Amino acid sequence: MTAKPALMVLGTSSGAGKSLMTAALCRVLRRRGETPLPFKGQNMSNNAWVDQAGGEMAYSQALQAWAAGLEPECAMNPVLLKPQGDSTSELIHLGHSVGSARAEHYYRDWFKPGWKAIRQGLEALQSSHPGGRLVLEGAGSPVEVNLQKRDLTNLRLAQYLRAHCVLVADIERGGVFAQIVGTLNLLRPVERPLIKGLLINRFRGRRELFDEGQRWLEANTGVPVLGVMPWLDELFPPEDSLDLLERRGRKRSAELNIAVLKLPSLSNFSDLDPLEAEPTVQLRWVAPGEELGLPDAVVIPGSKQTLRDLAAILNSGLGAALQAYNTGGGHVFGICGGMQMLGDELCDPEGLEGGAPSGNTSQAGLGLLPLRTVFSADKALRQRSSAALWPGGSHALEIEGFELHHGLTTINNASETCKPLCRDEELGWVKPFSDHGGLVAGTYLHGVFESGPWRRRWLNQLRERKGLAPLSEQQPHHSRQRDALLDRLADAFEQHINLEPLLNSSNG
């Protein structure tokens, strides 16, 4: 165990803001000269990251690692559940897939292996960072009475590590007093002393308007309110794809309108964060059945269930709209599963990607790129970098990211119109503008838009078609902007939150 007590961020519910408060806490401790070690025993998310060793982990723990000044490693998130639909999730233990499980069987079959993986992750993380302080994030609510006996990542972990816990409540949702009092009242007597402070999140308005509420909470719970965080949702996108509709509104300076397909099994939507951060770009999320319109480009992001999402696109009429859009000169760009959907054929003999609606193992794609994908149980998990051959310019630009996919994609009939997107030919392809339709491109590289010069060159291609002046390609990697946002988050945290009761209290 570490010499300094572990800290833990619990929440009264899902979406209370635990992930960002944990990231803020990591950055603040780093500023104080500590080595914070972010850790979430079990996470459920299709927004993933691949570490340097090829291990899969939740993106939110990668973000917390960057906040701590560390390289992300899968030990920070030893159990990851990736929803596949039909109450089934893929299970990732210590970075690698160990199978799938239905919700009703998960705790029966996977509780003991999960707890073992969590302990192994803790040991690995502390061994590689001696002297570090664990900063834990809980999951959902810590007092789901029907799940408490099989809890893997909340109070079981807090008790195991004797962690000092802060309880976060989202006042924006309403009912913050009931959230807090109800949660505290459902804690068992042995658990209650672990809660060292309360944190009110997403408060709008003048701070003094909550003074009376703070006095009431402290008088009626005996737990100090560490502070009140203001509304900061404009800094980072939501962790959960269900919250995408709550993202930022229209930008006054937007000059490009880019449609992004809101797939039913959307994954790795953090790929779009660098575009969201561009002041001249407006992203518009389009779900199957909604109007595509005439955007300047369409991006099809990753999917956890590629064939099911492809069927949703085709059956809703969105597929036909995409094909007509491209025939009329529109630009379409696919990432990972999105690129696979752009091809001619997708084969899923093992039913890994949702299966075809008819029960066949092969399904026709959108037919916008001459590609054939065959899915297999082997999963590509690795960080990559390569020189981009497209878009063209005065010199090739380096792009980097990671692969995270099942399946092998090959080009059909040695197409003369379809060219490699970069020097590593298997990473992506591009079919240029022609008399037969607009440009279509795709890549397996998650994070491709994080490269500032490449992103700007891609945007400038769209701007040229609209008669807009080019943007400067002298743009840093998105990681620098992300780091600046983490600093802003930590600045607000230090301004509004008193950490001393959390850091200095005892568990006696």
From Swiss-Prot:
InterPro entries xrefs: Class_I_gatase-like (IPR029062), CobQ/CobB/MinD/ParA_Nub-bd_dom (IPR002586), CobQ_GATase1 (IPR033949), CobQ_synth (IPR004459), GATase_3 (IPR011698), P-loop_NTPase (IPR027417)
One matching Pfam family: CbiA
Keyword terms of this UniProt record: Cobalamin biosynthesis, Glutamine amidotransferase
Pathway: Cofactor biosynthesis; adenosylcobalamin biosynthesis
Origin superkingdom: Bacteria
GO molecular function, one term: ABC-type vitamin B12 transporter activity
Catalytic site positions: C336 (nucleophile), H446
Residue ranges annotated for the GATase cobBQ-type domain, each copy included: 255-454
Keyword check for DNA-binding: no
Gene Ontology BP annotations: cobalamin biosynthetic process
Function field: Catalyzes amidations at positions B, D, E, and G on adenosylcobyrinic A,C-diamide. NH(2) groups are provided by glutamine, and one molecule of ATP is hydrogenolyzed for each amidation.
Family affiliation: Belongs to the CobB/CobQ family. CobQ subfamily.
Protein name as it appears in the record: Cobyric acid synthase
Organism: Synechococcus sp. (strain CC9311)
